[in-house]
């Protein structure tokens, strides 16, 4: 048990270095189920401006408004709260505005669930990251237990 705790401290330290790097970061967190990825990320998120979204086995039409509602809640912007971002361009614009207010952590936990229902998601995220996300004061964490799928997302023909 003590050894596992030490490993987690090392992982937290690595995440902290990415957090304080002063630049945009896109960080994959992968591993088998039940090894503590979510717990690690929840601990890391404490005290940070964070949007922590747990992906589901649902399509984008259902999940994007849920993610948009979390973005709106963090922003506190009455306009966004009244009409949370429900399209990718609106969500990305809201993330850009939020990042101007200080370092922002966006965690997409169990991303393979969402990708299973929307295969276009990796290319959409990659295009946004390449064109805009990498310029923001943002740390994007892509987490998943489906190790093979995460490997394809990160090392395939168009890696994130």
Regions found by a protein language model. Give the residues of each.
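Phosphate-binding site recognition
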Residues: 1-160
């Amino acid at each position: 048990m003590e050894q596992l705790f030490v490993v987690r401290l090392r992982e937290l330290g690595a995440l902290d270095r990415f957090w304080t790097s002063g630049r945009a970061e896109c960080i994959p967190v992968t591993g088998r189920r039940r090894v503590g990825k979510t717990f690690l990320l929840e601990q890391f998120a404490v005290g940070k401006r964070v949007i922590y979204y747990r992906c589901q086995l649902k399509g984008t039409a259902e999940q994007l408004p849920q993610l948009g509602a979390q973005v709106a809640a963090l922003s506190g912007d009455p306009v966004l709260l009244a009409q949370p971002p429900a399209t990718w361009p609106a969500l990305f614009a809201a993330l850009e505005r939020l990042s101007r207010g200080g370092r922002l952590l966006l965690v997409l936990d169990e991303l393979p669930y969402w990708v299973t229902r929307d295969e276009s998601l990796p290319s959409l995220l990659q295009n946004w990251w390449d064109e805009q996300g990498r310029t923001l004061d943002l740390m994007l964490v892509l987490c998943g237990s489906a190790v093979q799928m995460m490997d394809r997302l990160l090392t395939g023909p168009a890696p994130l």
